[in-house]
Amino acid sequence: MATIQIIIEEDNVTINVKKNQVPPIEVSPKIPPIEIENVKKNVLCPICLIAKVNTVLECTHVLCSNCVKKINVCPICRKTFQSINFFRL
């Protein structure tokens, strides 16, 4: 029976198996916290990819108000909607 030793360091995980050695596994770097300013600047409408999102549909998908005015079905999940919620970032 093989013995497994797991060594966890800050950003590396190494697994050693007695008799056989497994190469180190790279762990993804820690994801930095999301800053609200970055969200405001980078949230573009997934339909037109031009305008910032400012509308939430009943299905919780978000679009820009220009795209929402042209549709009555969510282009992402295909659910029909009756109400639209506008918001300001």
Swiss-Prot record:
Tell me which residue ranges form RING-type zinc fingers: 45-78
SUPFAM superfamilies attached to this UniProt entry: RING/U-box
Write down the Pfam families for this protein, in alphabetical order: zf-C3HC4_3
Q: Name one GO molecular function term.
A: zinc ion binding
Keywords linked to the UniProt accession: Metal-binding, Zinc, Zinc-finger
The entry's protein name is Putative RING finger protein 121R
What is the source species?
Invertebrate iridescent virus 6 (IIV-6)
